[in-house]
Amino acid sequence: MQRSRGFRSKSRRKMTKVVREGRSNPITNKLQKFEEGDLVHITINPSIQKGQPHPRFHGKTGKITDKKGKAYIVSLTDGNKAKELIIRPDHLKLQTSQ
């Protein structure tokens, strides 16, 4: 039988989260607002699968270009190629220093 190469394959360390008692995902992460042109860091929250980008983009920084429903369109360069990702705010953090 051929092994599966699913969306979360080869991401055992990257896609794990330490469970701490009395702590869950704060609602403020879901309610974050971003403006067009904001620089954001992509930090995947492994406990929320919806709106999650591919693990290769974890730790990258991009620019908000548009909003699509609850998610944001983030443009970044992957090598020399420009890419657009549709990511929910649970997996984004605003860059504080410019």
Curated annotation (Swiss-Prot):
The keyword Secreted is assigned to this record: no
UniProt record similarity statement: Belongs to the eukaryotic ribosomal protein eL21 family.
HAMAP family the UniProt entry points to: Ribosomal_eL21
Alphabetical keyword list: Ribonucleoprotein, Ribosomal protein
GO cellular component, one term: ribonucleoprotein complex
Chain's gene name: rpl21e
InterPro entries: Ribosomal_eL21 (IPR001147), Ribosomal_eL21_arc (IPR022856), Ribosomal_eL21_CS (IPR018259), Ribosomal_eL21_sf (IPR036948), Translation_prot_SH3-like_sf (IPR008991)
Keyword Flavoprotein found: no
Domain of life (superkingdom): Archaea
Gene Ontology terms, MF aspect: structural constituent of ribosome
Alphabetical list of Pfam families matching this protein: Ribosomal_L21e
Annotated protein name in UniProt: Large ribosomal subunit protein eL21
Compositionally biased spans, kind Basic residues: 1-17
Annotated spans, Disordered: 1-28
Cystine pairs: none
GO biological process: translation
